[in-house]
């Protein structure tokens, strides 16, 4: 698999997850009570799971900003790094996948298994797997380039 294909797949996952976070943010800001999207039964479970943070879970405002920052902004930064071919692009993609997986584990702890959480858990696993391939391909292409340049400069002498 070529680096270009892996980079494109990683961009897909980054855009998809960042867009999902933006939509989730919009839903929670549009109706902080959660009634419109039938999320209101989740608030008592949040307060029960995190009693020391119960003051934050009177509505979904804090959850909305947490979702946007933790999954939206981090993936947006990763997308930027991938587009710029930054040396940390593959690592940022791996970290985004790990952060999403941690987020999903917290959701499993609070609410148990739900279809959306399981789906995003699978998306996180795909993002992590692709980022691992991305890292490996970047490393092998960097090693290959270094070996060619070493061969070229030592052959001239």
Q: What are the residue ranges of the model-derived segments?
A:
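Topology signature of small-to-medium multi-pass alpha-helical membrane proteins
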Residues: 1-157
């Amino acid at each position: 698999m070529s680096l270009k294909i892996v980079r494109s797949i990683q961009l897909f996952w980054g855009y998809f997850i960042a867009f999902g976070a933006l939509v989730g943010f919009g839903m929670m800001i549009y109706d902080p009570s959660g009634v419109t999207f039938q999320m209101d039964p989740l608030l008592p479970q949040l307060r029960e799971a995190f009693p020391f943070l119960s003051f934050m879970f009177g509505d979904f405002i804090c959850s909305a900003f947490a979702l946007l920052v933790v999954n939206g902004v981090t993936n947006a930064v990763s997308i930027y790094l991938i587009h710029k071919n930054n040396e940390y692009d593959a690592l940022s993609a791996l970290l985004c996948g790990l952060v999403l997986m941690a987020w999903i584990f917290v959701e499993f702890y609070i609410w148990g298994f739900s279809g959306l959480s399981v789906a995003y858990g699978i998306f996180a696993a795909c993002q992590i797997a692709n980022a691992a391939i991305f890292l490996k391909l970047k490393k092998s292409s960097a090693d290959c380039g270094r070996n060619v340049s070493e061969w070229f400069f030592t052959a001239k002498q």
